[in-house]
Amino acid sequence: MIDAEGFRANVGIVICNNQGQVFWARRYGQHSWQFPQGGVDDGETPEQTMYRELHEEVGLRPEDVEIVASSKHWLRYKLPKRLIRRDSSPVCIGQKQKWFLLKLRCKDEDVNLLKTHHPEFDDWRWVSYWYPVRQVVSFKRDVYRRVMKEFAPFAMPFNKREQQKDHWRNKR
C-alpha cells in the first residue's frame, strides 16, 4: 500500500531479550544489518503485519513474543534516489513505518531465518540497545534514532523490570 505522497506502509520490529539487548539481522547476501520490517498488505492491520513478518523473517509465532509497546506515530524515511524504482506505479519514494517493541519469550534456538523460500536474513545476533542507531544504513538512521528513543523507557533490561515488579509485590 503506497499512499498519495509515495510512502509505502510498513512495520518495523524491535525484539528485546531479558538483558535489554536487541535482535540485529544481516540482510540475505549483503553486508547490511537491520531490524525486521515489512510492508502492510491490503486489509491488514499493522499488528497483523507485524506477526506475519515476524514469522516470515524470524520464524517466530505470536506466543514466542510479547508486545511491550508500539510507536505513537508512523515514522517516515525517504529512499535514496538510486533505490527508487521509477518503472513501478505508483512510485514508492520511501517507507512510513509503525514500530513494535517485542519481548522475546522463547529460546534463541527458536529463531529460524529460513522459514520461507526467500529469506530476508542470513545471520543474526544480540547487540546493545543503541548499537543499531549507529550501524543501520544512513537513510534509516533518523527513524531508528527516533523509535529507539521512544522505546527506551520500556526497554530497560526486562529481567530488572520483573525483579522490580516482584520487589513491589513483596512490599505490599
Swiss-Prot record:
Alphabetic keyword roster: Hydrolase
EC category: hydrolase
Example GO molecular function: mRNA 5'-diphosphatase activity
Motif Nudix box: positions: 38-59
Start and end residues of each Nudix hydrolase domain: 6-149
EC number in record: 3.6.1.-
GO biological process, one term: mRNA catabolic process
4Fe-4S is among the record's keywords: no
The keyword Hydrolase belongs to this UniProt entry's keyword annotation: yes
Highest taxon, organism lineage: Bacteria
Annotated Pfam families: NUDIX
PROSITE patterns assigned to the protein according to its UniProt record, in alphabetical order: NUDIX (PS51462), NUDIX_BOX (PS00893)
Coiled coil: none
Cofactor: a divalent metal cation
CDD domains linked: NUDIX_Ap4A_hydrolase_plant_like (cd03671)
InterPro entries on file: Nudix_hydrolase, NUDIX_hydrolase-like_dom_sf, NUDIX_hydrolase_CS, NUDIX_hydrolase_dom, RppH
GO CC annotations, alphabetized: cytoplasm
NCBIfam families: PRK00714.1-1 (NF001934), PRK00714.1-3 (NF001936), PRK00714.1-4 (NF001937), PRK00714.1-5 (NF001938)
Annotated function: Accelerates the degradation of transcripts by removing pyrophosphate from the 5'-end of triphosphorylated RNA, leading to a more labile monophosphorylated state that can stimulate subsequent ribonuclease cleavage.
Family to which this protein belongs: Belongs to the Nudix hydrolase family. RppH subfamily.
Designated name of the protein: RNA pyrophosphohydrolase
Taxonomic placement: Bacteria, Pseudomonadati, Pseudomonadota, Gammaproteobacteria, Alteromonadales
